[in-house]
Amino acid sequence: MYMLNESTKEILKKPFGKVYKELPPINRKVNIIAVGDITTKNLLSKSIIPNLSIIDLKTKRNIPVKINHKFKTVFEVNNPQGCISDEAEETIKYISSLDMVDTALIVKDGEEDLLTMMVIRYFPKDTIVLYGQPDEGVVLLTINQDLKHKINNILSMMDKI
């Protein structure tokens, strides 16, 4: 399990990509991963069905979010706040090896925020990842080798228990 520490908390406050106030146009010909309930809900409202949605059914840690969508495949994991559990990492790694569409990974205990790093680590280059930047908008990034390298550096700085 990876755990945040003071140095990685500071690094992770900055978005990994450009922050948009509104959902930007998205290339639908590549894998699309949504991390966060509001991001997922916004994509679905525009009839964009992500290959994978990572959600915990709440926003800002405790406000419930209802997503009116029946995902084709659902996985559930525990992922404590401020951590990346081994269970969550292995599940994302497994999902990345499949050719899945309309899949949900529901974090039933904890939060999903840090799982963006596992998506970047395990999904192929050119995958589009969207995640919410609280009170700012949505971050859109495209996985590339530089981003994978940056994420691996951050993960190496986190506490491993």
From Swiss-Prot:
The keyword Transferase applies. GTP binds at residues 37-38, 56, 58, 112, 135. GO terms for molecular function: GTP binding; kinase activity. Its EC number is 2.7.1.237. It catalyses: 3'-dephospho-CoA + GTP = GDP + CoA + H(+). One of its GO terms (biological process) is coenzyme A biosynthetic process. InterPro entries: GTP-dep_dephospho-CoA_kin. The keyword Hydrolase does not apply. Keywords: Coenzyme A biosynthesis, GTP-binding, Kinase, Nucleotide-binding, Transferase. Belongs to the GTP-dependent DPCK family. This is GTP-dependent dephospho-CoA kinase. It comes from Methanococcus aeolicus (strain ATCC BAA-1280 / DSM 17508 / OCM 812 / Nankai-3).
